[in-house]
Protein backbone atom coordinates (compact mmCIF):
# COMPACT_ATOMS: atom_id res chain seq x y z
CA UNK A 1 0.00 0.00 0.00
CA UNK A 2 1.32 3.41 -0.96
CA UNK A 3 1.68 5.86 1.94
CA UNK A 4 0.53 9.40 1.20
CA UNK A 5 2.26 12.13 3.17
CA UNK A 6 -0.12 14.91 4.19
CA UNK A 7 0.93 18.14 5.88
CA UNK A 8 -1.73 20.25 7.52
CA UNK A 9 -1.32 23.84 8.71
CA UNK A 10 -3.45 24.50 11.77
CA UNK A 11 -4.01 26.56 14.87
CA UNK A 12 -6.14 25.56 17.81
CA UNK A 13 -9.49 25.08 16.14
CA UNK A 14 -11.10 24.53 12.79
CA UNK A 15 -9.12 21.44 11.81
CA UNK A 16 -10.56 18.81 14.15
CA UNK A 17 -12.70 16.98 11.57
CA UNK A 18 -10.00 16.78 8.94
CA UNK A 19 -7.35 15.66 11.46
CA UNK A 20 -9.64 12.91 12.77
CA UNK A 21 -10.36 11.80 9.21
CA UNK A 22 -6.67 11.58 8.28
CA UNK A 23 -5.54 9.76 11.43
CA UNK A 24 -8.08 7.02 10.71
CA UNK A 25 -6.67 6.37 7.23
CA UNK A 26 -4.07 3.59 7.11
CA UNK A 27 -2.34 5.00 4.02
CA UNK A 28 -1.81 8.53 5.41
CA UNK A 29 1.30 9.80 7.19
CA UNK A 30 0.17 13.06 8.78
CA UNK A 31 2.28 16.02 9.85
CA UNK A 32 0.72 18.95 11.70
CA UNK A 33 2.32 22.37 11.40
CA UNK A 34 0.86 24.29 14.31
CA UNK A 35 0.98 28.02 14.95
CA UNK A 36 0.74 29.03 18.58
CA UNK A 37 -0.35 32.64 18.61
CA UNK A 38 -3.57 32.30 20.61
CA UNK A 39 -3.77 34.82 23.43
CA UNK A 40 -7.33 34.47 24.71
CA UNK A 41 -8.66 33.29 28.08
CA UNK A 42 -6.15 31.31 30.13
CA UNK A 43 -3.64 31.23 27.27
CA UNK A 44 -3.44 35.01 27.20
CA UNK A 45 -2.99 35.19 30.96
CA UNK A 46 -0.24 32.58 30.88
CA UNK A 47 1.55 34.29 27.98
CA UNK A 48 1.38 37.62 29.80
CA UNK A 49 2.87 36.15 32.99
CA UNK A 50 5.41 33.68 31.56
CA UNK A 51 7.83 35.43 29.17
CA UNK A 52 8.54 33.50 25.97
CA UNK A 53 5.54 31.19 26.26
CA UNK A 54 3.61 30.80 23.02
CA UNK A 55 -0.04 29.68 22.97
CA UNK A 56 -0.23 26.28 24.69
CA UNK A 57 -3.93 25.90 23.88
CA UNK A 58 -3.21 25.58 20.15
CA UNK A 59 -1.11 22.49 20.86
CA UNK A 60 -3.36 21.13 23.62
CA UNK A 61 -6.38 21.25 21.31
CA UNK A 62 -4.54 19.51 18.47
CA UNK A 63 -3.21 16.85 20.86
CA UNK A 64 -6.74 16.19 22.07
CA UNK A 65 -7.81 15.57 18.45
CA UNK A 66 -5.11 12.89 18.20
CA UNK A 67 -6.00 11.03 21.37
CA UNK A 68 -7.23 7.50 20.82
CA UNK A 69 -10.65 7.53 22.44
CA UNK A 70 -10.82 3.73 22.33
CA UNK A 71 -8.22 3.60 25.10
CA UNK A 72 -9.40 4.26 28.67
CA UNK A 73 -6.00 5.75 29.57
CA UNK A 74 -6.09 8.19 26.65
CA UNK A 75 -9.76 9.05 27.22
CA UNK A 76 -8.98 9.91 30.86
CA UNK A 77 -5.96 11.93 29.78
CA UNK A 78 -8.14 13.95 27.41
CA UNK A 79 -10.57 14.75 30.23
CA UNK A 80 -7.68 15.97 32.38
CA UNK A 81 -6.17 18.10 29.59
CA UNK A 82 -9.51 19.60 28.57
CA UNK A 83 -10.77 20.30 32.10
CA UNK A 84 -11.60 23.95 32.84
CA UNK A 85 -12.02 25.37 36.31
CA UNK A 86 -15.65 26.43 36.70
CA UNK A 87 -15.36 28.46 39.90
CA UNK A 88 -13.07 31.09 41.34
CA UNK A 89 -9.91 29.57 42.76
CA UNK A 90 -6.95 31.64 43.83
CA UNK A 91 -3.63 30.53 42.43
CA UNK A 92 -2.16 30.47 45.95
CA UNK A 93 -4.90 28.20 47.33
CA UNK A 94 -4.53 25.85 44.36
CA UNK A 95 -0.74 25.76 44.85
CA UNK A 96 -1.01 24.81 48.52
CA UNK A 97 -3.49 22.02 47.81
CA UNK A 98 -1.48 20.57 44.91
CA UNK A 99 1.77 20.83 46.89
CA UNK A 100 0.27 18.96 49.83
CA UNK A 101 -1.79 16.61 47.61
CA UNK A 102 -4.87 17.61 49.59
CA UNK A 103 -8.36 17.84 48.19
CA UNK A 104 -7.15 17.04 44.66
CA UNK A 105 -10.62 15.83 43.70
CA UNK A 106 -11.92 19.29 44.61
CA UNK A 107 -9.70 20.88 41.95
CA UNK A 108 -8.77 18.27 39.38
CA UNK A 109 -11.07 15.86 37.52
CA UNK A 110 -11.32 12.39 39.05
CA UNK A 111 -9.96 10.87 35.83
CA UNK A 112 -6.44 11.79 36.95
CA UNK A 113 -6.69 8.93 39.46
CA UNK A 114 -7.18 6.42 36.62
CA UNK A 115 -3.97 7.38 34.82
CA UNK A 116 -0.78 5.36 35.13
CA UNK A 117 1.05 6.24 38.32
CA UNK A 118 4.03 7.85 36.51
CA UNK A 119 1.81 9.93 34.22
CA UNK A 120 -0.22 11.20 37.18
CA UNK A 121 3.02 12.02 39.02
CA UNK A 122 4.39 13.91 35.99
CA UNK A 123 1.16 15.86 35.52
CA UNK A 124 1.04 16.90 39.18
CA UNK A 125 4.74 17.83 39.06
CA UNK A 126 4.23 20.03 35.97
CA UNK A 127 1.17 21.63 37.57
CA UNK A 128 3.15 22.37 40.71
CA UNK A 129 5.93 23.99 38.65
CA UNK A 130 3.55 26.30 36.77
CA UNK A 131 1.48 27.20 39.83
CA UNK A 132 4.57 27.84 41.95
CA UNK A 133 5.86 30.19 39.24
CA UNK A 134 2.52 32.01 39.06
CA UNK A 135 1.65 32.06 42.78
CA UNK A 136 2.90 35.61 43.26
CA UNK A 137 0.29 36.84 40.76
CA UNK A 138 -3.34 37.64 41.46
CA UNK A 139 -4.56 35.19 38.82
CA UNK A 140 -7.94 33.62 39.36
CA UNK A 141 -8.24 30.20 37.75
CA UNK A 142 -11.88 30.43 36.65
CA UNK A 143 -12.18 29.13 33.05
CA UNK A 144 -8.47 28.18 33.02
CA UNK A 145 -7.60 25.02 31.13
CA UNK A 146 -5.76 22.47 33.24
CA UNK A 147 -3.92 21.31 30.11
CA UNK A 148 -2.55 24.82 29.58
CA UNK A 149 -1.19 24.87 33.14
CA UNK A 150 0.41 21.45 32.59
CA UNK A 151 2.00 22.67 29.35
CA UNK A 152 3.25 25.84 31.08
CA UNK A 153 4.87 23.67 33.76
CA UNK A 154 6.67 21.62 31.11
CA UNK A 155 7.81 24.84 29.40
CA UNK A 156 9.23 26.19 32.66
CA UNK A 157 10.89 22.88 33.57
CA UNK A 158 12.55 22.75 30.15
CA UNK A 159 14.11 26.19 30.70
CA UNK A 160 11.54 27.95 28.51
CA UNK A 161 12.34 25.85 25.43
CA UNK A 162 8.95 25.82 23.70
CA UNK A 163 9.81 23.15 21.12
CA UNK A 164 11.10 20.80 23.81
CA UNK A 165 7.91 21.46 25.80
CA UNK A 166 5.87 20.47 22.72
CA UNK A 167 7.84 17.23 22.45
CA UNK A 168 7.44 16.41 26.16
CA UNK A 169 3.70 17.20 26.04
CA UNK A 170 3.36 14.94 22.99
CA UNK A 171 4.87 12.08 24.99
CA UNK A 172 1.64 11.86 27.00
CA UNK A 173 -0.35 10.74 23.96
CA UNK A 174 -0.05 7.75 21.66
CA UNK A 175 0.19 8.99 18.08
CA UNK A 176 2.11 8.48 14.85
CA UNK A 177 1.40 12.05 13.77
CA UNK A 178 4.43 14.31 13.52
CA UNK A 179 3.87 17.67 15.23
CA UNK A 180 5.92 20.75 14.38
CA UNK A 181 5.76 24.20 15.94
CA UNK A 182 5.94 26.87 13.25
CA UNK A 183 5.57 29.84 15.60
CA UNK A 184 8.27 32.31 16.47
CA UNK A 185 8.42 33.97 19.88
CA UNK A 186 8.32 37.73 19.97
CA UNK A 187 11.60 39.09 18.77
CA UNK A 188 11.36 42.29 20.82
Segment roles from a protein language model:
Residues 1-6:
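Extreme N-terminal starter segment of soluble prokaryotic enzymes
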Residues 10-11:
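Glycine-rich Rossmann-fold phosphate-binding loop(s) that bind the pyrophosphate
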Residues 14-19:
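Short glycine/serine/threonine-rich phosphate/pyrophosphate-binding segments
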Residues 23-28:
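Short, conserved loop/helix-junction motifs that constitute active-site signature segments
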Residues 30-37:
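Short internal beta-strands
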Residues 37-188:
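Electropositive, gly/pro-rich neighborhoods at or near active sites that engage anionic ligands
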Amino acid sequence: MKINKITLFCGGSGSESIIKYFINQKNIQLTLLINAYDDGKSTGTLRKNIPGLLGPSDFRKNFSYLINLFSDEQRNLKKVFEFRFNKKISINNFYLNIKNSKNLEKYIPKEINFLEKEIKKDILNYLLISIKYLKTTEINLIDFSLGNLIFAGIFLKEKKNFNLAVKKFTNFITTKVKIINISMPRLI
